[in-house]
Amino acid sequence: MRGVETRIQEIRHKIFTEVARMAYHTEWSVKDRMEALPYKIIPGEKGNFRNDVFLERAIVGERLRLAMGLPYRSAAEHSPISDGIEAADKDETYYTPPLINVIKFACNACPEKRVHVTDGCQGCLAHPCMEVCPKDAISLDRTTGKSVIDQEKCIKCGRCASVCSYNAIIVQERPCAKACGMDAISSDENGKANIDYDKCVSCGQCLVNCPFGAIADKSQIFQTIRAIQSGEKVYAAVAPAFVGQFGPKVTPGKLRAAMKALGFADVFEVAIGADLCAKQEAEDFLKEVPDELPFMATSCCPAWSVMAKKLFPEHAKCISMALTPMTLTARLIKQHNPDARVVFIGPCAAKKLEAMRRSVRSEVDFVLTFEEMTGIFSAKHVDLENIKEDPAGVSDASTDGRNFAVAGGVAQAVVNVIKRDHPDQEVKVANAEGLKECRQLLKLATLGKYPGYLLEGMACPGVCVAGAGTMQAIKKSQTSVGLYAKQSTHKTSSETEYIKELDKLVD
């Protein structure tokens, strides 16, 4: 639903804005404010969306807790919304797993999957639906002449739906489960959505595909602002997918000016880290494939790499050991600014999971999504479209580095680095987007179908510009990123001034 302003986006934006306002108003009691906010966000005597004002406020209360980085509470728990706030009210606090949470009393308990005959059935003479059903689950209502499905016999194959000339048979799936490429969502004893965290890779696709807004992730909005207010030098590292996310008129120069207005010490585009990553992966590919590894898979998408290691542990070594663009950018910032604290701002929920790794925690201090950033801008009344542009922009990455955010961009960047130094080197590439496709790609690779290949995997259908923390329509984002990438003065990743820093960063 990216690019469509729904009630869910409206509520999320209000919550992010209010959490940011709490952080800025140090004179307020955070505990008291937390208890009062559900009444501000859902005012009056009547619910706006569910016709139950108490339920709506309870849901907002849990959303507030998660936005503060606090654990989700079940409806059975009796405790204040602000319970545990003392731990969250510190800029060094980092949330604990799980990152993605189902607010059970917000869940609609949608059917997992069912095949349903609608009123569109015309009771035709042919009844092809009956003929193709492998379980004889479809019969004829002699009164109306319309088809009826015996749900006890139905195996949900959908063949009947595919042959209906009137499209009168539909296959309904729970939206969150359908979006989950890891098959990590099932039903609990009450029919509510339940996440299997042994399978979940925190891509966040369930979050953006739930029409009831019952799934939410944790945030560091509050802690980031408090770090800035404490006087620390906080640097923003903005992911390549940022173009257009804050409005069609918001240029990189305006974004930089807006970030500086919030108190950030400086702003860098993570595309410079993407350039470094492409160079490192190119060197590793030339060194290891095919002599040491049968194939090499890219490393920049954390949900993809975690999935690969969960499901194909025997081929874990085939996932590139190159540092991700986020980590490389953070290291670069801290190498030149030892006292810096780094905030990664991007499209991705899984980057929050990556930043929780022990090896990354010292590099990346906070992770925010583009959507969460809009709440911070709103809280400080920063008008991004009309702010005076900073001519410095956000740095000078290559075209290939900026194209990391779109399908095929990562692999192409690596190939271009290799081709620049080894023009006769053949590099075969295969890529997949969406975890279902990624799983199939890796399965085929482990069976020997992609010998000597460079594999690019991206967990989100539509790649980074379609991440869980984005707001702009996906096609529009793809176009925006492509146009911005073409403006770079460097084509390939190995041409940028930052490449000379790589050896220092990966030692």
Residue ranges with predicted function:
Residues A126-Q151, R159-D196, V201, Q205-Q220, ...:
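Iron-sulfur cluster-binding cysteine motifs and their immediate structural context
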Residues M1-S79, G84, D217-D507:
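Iron-sulfur-associated redox domains of electron-transfer enzymes in respiratory
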Residues A87, Y95, I155, P175:
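Short sequence/structural segments immediately N-terminal
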